[in-house]
């Protein structure tokens, strides 16, 4: 039987907390920051917990959750 592997791209983008929550960064902040407002750039900083509906989908891609 083939070993099931975790999605390596997803492993680099998500951090798993001690209580099995998934943290992710915001989208839309790689470039073109000058055209966005200061408020937009400030709100895109930091990390956010993954939504519960997405958690079920992501759980299948990461083994060991």
From Swiss-Prot:
Name the Gene Ontology molecular function terms of this record.
Answer: structural constituent of ribosome
Which InterPro entries does UniProt cross-reference here? Ribosomal_bL35, Ribosomal_bL35-like, Ribosomal_bL35_CS, Ribosomal_bL35_sf
Example of a GO biological process term? translation
Instruction: Enumerate the Gene3D superfamilies for this protein.
Output: 4.10.410.60
The alphabetized UniProt keywords are:
Ribonucleoprotein, Ribosomal protein
Q: Where are the transmembrane segments?
A: none
What the entry lists under SUPFAM superfamilies is as follows: L35p-like (SSF143034)
Q: Which Pfam family, an example, fits this chain?
A: Ribosomal_L35p
What PROSITE patterns would the database entry show? RIBOSOMAL_L35
Superkingdom is Bacteria
Q: Name one GO cellular component term.
A: cytosolic large ribosomal subunit
- Record-linked HAMAP family: Ribosomal_bL35 (MF_00514)
What is stated as this protein's family in its record? Belongs to the bacterial ribosomal protein bL35 family.
Q: What is this protein called?
A: Large ribosomal subunit protein bL35
Species in which this protein is naturally found: Phytoplasma australiense
């Amino acid at each position: 039987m083939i070993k099931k592997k975790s999605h390596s791209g997803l492993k680099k983008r998500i951090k798993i907390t001690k209580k099995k929550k998934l943290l992710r960064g915001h989208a839309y902040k790689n470039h073109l920051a000058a055209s966005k407002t200061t408020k937009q750039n400030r709100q895109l900083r930091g990390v956010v917990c993954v939504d519960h509906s997405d958690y079920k989908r992501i759980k299948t891609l990461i083994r060991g959750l």
